[in-house]
């Protein structure tokens, strides 16, 4: 048993514990103090960082403010220079050239487009007489003549008109430059129904009066006032767009000479038996109380039962449904159920039709039915044309006076015609006492109720249908039987068809010929009378003679004449009267002619027809009719028919139809959508607020304004930037691709404004490099090639290609082809390549032969480029052309009369083109690498070209200076190699060439290694997929060309994988 250990005194233990606790406490306090110090240090650092960040932010904001202030100051200074420049040029005396001795530092449309139109106009350059006087290369017996599709005087021109005029002016300017004697005749159209409607809306909106309050004479006076205002506005717009029309020959379709032509045409065609008065079914607008043409009917598609409002009515009505009701067969309890979309017309039913082969109704042949609401006995007829026995009940109601199909059926069976409506669309006395005086769609509801009372209404169901609306009033079109004047079209249409089939008249695009044949071979007589006040009053007089019963529906009781006296004399001769006293009454028809009648005479009436004027002899027939494809039948066909009938000649040799302009969403332009664009707003620019304010200037109602405002805000949130006339014209022509509608995006027009700036700067560059003393030599195409260098030969080859493509495009009416060729020449070849390459040449001594040769080449290409561009951009090209020095032989005072560039076959050089293309591919490859790694152009990098053979080594070594400049390289080494280089990124141009950039110090290599690994995975995947295709058993059956192509692709992928691996290895070694 061990001895017990001596115990430590309690006091000592307590002291030790206390000491240890104190040490722990101190340690904790020290640790806490240290943490607190660290925290304070961290907070101090954070505070310092925040302070630094704040200071940096403040510094950046200050720098931004200073930069903005500097830019604003610079912009204001530039704007001041531009304002002063414009003020100076606006002082140019009318008709004199603008001073272009100093060009602004950048392109400004307003400055460029000032003065030149007055210069052209006042010097008579638009007239063929002046052209023949001063154009040295004019060919006087070769003419090019077009007439403008006359815009309606209903309002301002829109972008559709701008497209038409841009195309026409481009074509006219091209032919004028080619030395053909050019005449482009301007004019406006009175647009009967359209103009009457807008003026009626205007006087109601302003004074709450109708045309009937003013009377015919007073209202016509108001319309002439409107024509004066808007005719002048249209003329101003055409001038602003640069249209080179001969204003000395301007016409209006209701001026004295055109009115004489209309009267003469009507009288001749009446006397020839081509115009007759008869009662037929027409499109009737109850709101306007007139017949309207097919083109003035808009159709909407209804998929199912739809409630709709109708002008002049309260509430909404049922459309898109079939109403079913029953007729009772006379003398029996049998019912025949019929279905109709227009149940109100049953009040004027005069028959029920069944199919002759329908055995269900054989027993009813020759029987009658009793009208359920008026008790009238109506026949049950058999008709295999109208009735489809398998549709519905196989029974059809017949309303001859209010349905086209029923009308034709009634003519076949000799049925009674009962007119149900007044001109205003009210039910007349034929509808019965219960319904007379009702509005037609109120009658729809009332008829349903009346049938329900008799238990004869069987219900209604959804029915897909097309509903015709008046384009002017939006009222539902009512087919109505009305006495009207008609032109017999069969023979004229047959001649028009033959003209196209025989190739005497060409239609471009050719696809429209199908429409031409379909319309004209199925043509019906043309209703030419309108129940309006504004228009050419019909020169026909109803004659009531002693002893003869009056019948205004009988054509034989009508005579024609240019005035009352002539009509009286014609009546005496026609009816073999002893004197005018035998005429009890001779009253002129109050109706006016369809606008298309006078428009149909336009190509020859503008030349002075019916007189045989000098213009008729010199300029008719015209060369081309250019217009929208939507009026091929309504205008073009009628001009052809009337031209052949009245002059014995086709009015033009060729028709070119452009597509329709729509908004960027592909929607038809409509004021109520707010997407109708005024060309002036594109030319000058306009703010959003101003765009919205313009909506209130028209005749839109409050709901339409609200809808249009929403559309404007959506499409133009910041308004429309100033683009200028030239950019707008070029954009519109560039959009034209035959047969396709144009979905116009204003941003594309802005892009072409920037293109104008490129051309401006290119010409300013030429001025600086040519020098004030430069005088170009007489033009000698072959001499330019002598002792020149590759870049000069290349740009001449590019010019030759642009000329060739432009000529082809104009001949084919492929304006997109022309604009693309010109755009590519100026931007891709002149600006992006040639001008950059000439900088080193222009740094040589002044007497250097290659420098002088380059000056001549540069001048030649600028001159050619401006002439090619002139038909599309007349203002910019005139300004820059006038700023250039002249060759000794160039004495023409304006670019518009200069010769269009001629093809120079000696400049065509396929070898130099291919060589430069390969160089450009290399440049694109290098630039692509730089863009991928976000390396700015200002950062010059050592660059390598690895090639596979001696031929490529020599080719690219020879062009290395050219490549180096455009690839932003500090040095360019060309060698035969397939090795990677330290610190280099690689791009494979093709199987023969790779580009390498030394990016050490410019790129984060760790980031790039990760990117390259991802790239390699995709390359390997593509490689394995392609290889697996070649291992299938049936691969030998694959066509040889495809197998060869696969072999090349596999080889290229393998090579790119190897290069990528080497690059990853190189980057890894750098360990950066």
Swiss-Prot record:
Motif mapping: 'KMSKS' region: 668-672
Compositionally biased intervals (Basic and acidic residues): 16-79
Record GO cellular component, one term: extracellular matrix
Reactions listed under catalytic activity: tRNA(Val) + L-valine + ATP = L-valyl-tRNA(Val) + AMP + diphosphate
EC number assigned by the record: 6.1.1.9
GO MF term set: aminoacyl-tRNA deacylase activity; ATP binding; valine-tRNA ligase activity
Listed name of the protein: Probable valine--tRNA ligase, cytoplasmic
Gene: valS1
């Amino acid at each position: 048993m061990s001895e017990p250990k001596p115990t430590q005194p309690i006091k000592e233990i307590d002291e030790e514990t206390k000491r240890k606790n104190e040490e722990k406490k101190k340690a904790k306090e020290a640790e806490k103090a240290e943490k607190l110090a660290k925290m304070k240090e961290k907070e101090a650092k954070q505070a310092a960082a925040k302070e630094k960040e704040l200071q940096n932010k403040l510094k950046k904001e200050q720098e931004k403010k200073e930069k903005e202030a500097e830019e604003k100051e610079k912009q204001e200074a530039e704007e001041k220079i531009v304002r002063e420049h414009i003020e100076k040029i606006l002082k140019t005396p009318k008709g004199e050239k603008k001073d272009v001795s100093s060009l602004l530092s950048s392109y400004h449309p307003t400055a460029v487009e000032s003065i030149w139109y007055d210069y052209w106009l006042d010097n008579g350059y638009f007239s063929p007489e002046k052209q023949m006087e001063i154009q040295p290369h004019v060919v006087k017996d070769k003419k090019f003549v077009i007439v403008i599709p006359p815009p309606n005087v209903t309002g301002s021109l829109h972008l559709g008109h701008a497209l038409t005029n841009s195309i026409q002016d481009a074509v006219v300017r091209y032919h004028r430059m080619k030395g053909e004697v050019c005449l482009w005749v301007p004019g406006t159209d009175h647009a009967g129904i359209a103009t009457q409607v807008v003026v009626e809306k205007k006087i109601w909106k302003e004074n709450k009066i109708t045309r009937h309050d003013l009377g015919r004479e007073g209202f016509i006076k108001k319309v002439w006032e409107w024509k004066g205002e808007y005719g002048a506005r249209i003329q101003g717009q055409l001038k602003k767009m640069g249209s080179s029309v001969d204003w000395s020959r301007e016409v209006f379709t209701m001026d004295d000479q055109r009115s004489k032509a209309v009267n003469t045409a009507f009288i001749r065609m009446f006397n020839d038996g081509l115009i007759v008065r008869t009662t037929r079914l027409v499109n009737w607008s109850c709101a306007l109380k007139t017949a309207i043409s097919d083109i003035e009917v808009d159709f909407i598609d209804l998929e199912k039962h739809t409630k709709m409002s109708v002008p002049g009515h309260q509430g909404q009505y049922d459309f898109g449904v079939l109403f079913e009701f029953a007729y009772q067969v006379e003398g029996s309890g049998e019912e025949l159920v019929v279905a109709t979309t227009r149940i109100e017309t049953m009040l004027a039913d005069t028959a029920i039709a069944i199919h002759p082969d329908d055995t269900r109704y054989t027993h009813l042949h020759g029987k009658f039915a009793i009208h359920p609401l008026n008790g009238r006995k109506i026949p049950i007829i058999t008709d295999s044309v109208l009735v489809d026995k398998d549709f519905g009940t196989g029974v059809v109601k017949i309303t001859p006076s209010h349905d086209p199909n029923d009308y034709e059926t009634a003519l076949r069976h000799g049925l009674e015609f009962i007119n149900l409506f007044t001109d205003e669309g009210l039910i007349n006395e034929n509808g019965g006492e219960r319904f007379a005086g009702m509005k037609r769609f109120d009658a729809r509801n009332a008829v349903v109720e009346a049938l329900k009372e008799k238990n004869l209404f069987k219900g209604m169901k959804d029915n897909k249908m097309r509903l015709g609306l008046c384009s002017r009033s939006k009222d539902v079109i009512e087919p109505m039987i009305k006495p009207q004047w008609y032109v017999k079209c069969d023979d004229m249409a047959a001649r028009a068809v033959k003209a196209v089939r025989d190739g005497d008249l060409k239609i471009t695009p050719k696809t429209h010929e199908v429409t031409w044949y379909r319309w004209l071979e199925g043509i019906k007589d043309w209703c030419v009378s309108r129940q309006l006040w504004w228009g050419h009053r019909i020169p026909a007089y109803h004659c009531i003679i002693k002893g003869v019963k009056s019948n205004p529906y009988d054509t034989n009781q009508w005579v024609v004449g240019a005035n009352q006296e002539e009509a009286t004399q014609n009546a005496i001769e026609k009816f073999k009267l002893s004197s005018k006293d035998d005429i009890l009454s001779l009253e002129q028809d109050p109706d006016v002619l369809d606008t298309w009648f006078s428009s149909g005479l336009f190509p020859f009436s503008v030349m002075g027809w019916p007189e045989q004027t000098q213009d008729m002899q010199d300029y008719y027939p015209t060369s081309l009719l250019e217009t929208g494809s939507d009026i091929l039948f309504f205008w073009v066909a009628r001009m052809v028919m009337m031209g052949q009938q009245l002059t014995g000649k086709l009015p033009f040799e060729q028709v070119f139809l452009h597509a329709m302009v729509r908004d960027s969403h592909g929607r038809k332009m409509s004021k109520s959508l707010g997407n109708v664009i005024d060309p002036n707003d594109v030319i000058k620019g306009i703010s959003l607020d101003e765009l919205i304010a313009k909506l209130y200037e028209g005749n839109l109602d409050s709901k339409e304004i609200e809808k249009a405002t929403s559309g404007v805000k959506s499409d133009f949130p910041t308004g429309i930037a100033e683009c200028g006339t030239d950019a707008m014209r070029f954009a519109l022509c560039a959009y034209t691709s035959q047969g396709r509608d144009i979905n116009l995006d204003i941003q594309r027009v802005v892009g072409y404004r920037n293109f104008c700036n490129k051309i401006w700067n290119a010409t300013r560059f030429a001025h600086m490099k040519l020098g004030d003393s430069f005088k170009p030599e007489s033009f000698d195409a072959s001499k330019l090639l002598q002792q020149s260098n590759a870049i000069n030969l290349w740009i001449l080859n590019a010019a030759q290609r642009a000329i060739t493509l432009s000529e082809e495009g104009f001949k084919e009416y492929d304006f997109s082809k022309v604009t693309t060729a010109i755009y590519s020449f100026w931007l891709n070849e002149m600006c992006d390549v040639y001008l950059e390459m000439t900088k080193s040449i222009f740094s040589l001594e002044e007497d250097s032969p290659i420098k002088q040769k380059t000056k001549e080449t540069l001048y030649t290409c600028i001159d050619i480029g401006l002439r090619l561009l002139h038909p599309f951009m007349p203002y910019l090209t005139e300004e820059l052309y006038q700023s250039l020095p002249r060759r000794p032989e160039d004495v023409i005072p304006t670019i518009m009369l200069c010769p269009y560039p001629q093809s120079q076959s000696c400049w065509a050089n396929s070898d130099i083109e291919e060589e430069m293309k390969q160089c450009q591919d290399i440049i694109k490859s290098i630039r692509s690498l730089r863009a991928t790694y976000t390396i700015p152009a200002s950062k010059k990098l050592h660059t390598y070209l690895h090639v596979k053979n001696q031929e490529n080594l020599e080719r690219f070594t020879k062009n290395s200076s050219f490549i180096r400049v455009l690839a932003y390289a500090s040095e360019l080494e060309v060698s035969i190699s397939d090795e990677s280089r330290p610190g280099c990124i690689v791009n494979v141009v093709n199987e023969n060439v790779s580009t390498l950039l030394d990016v050490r110090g410019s790129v984060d290599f760790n980031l790039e290694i990760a990117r390259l690994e991802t790239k390699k995975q995709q390359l390997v995947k593509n490689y394995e997929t392609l290889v697996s295709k070649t291992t299938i058993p049936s691969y030998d059956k694959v066509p040889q060309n495809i197998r060869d192509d696969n072999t090349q692709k596999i080889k290229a992928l393998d090579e790119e994988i190897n290069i990528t691996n080497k690059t990853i290895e190189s980057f890894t070694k750098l360990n950066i």
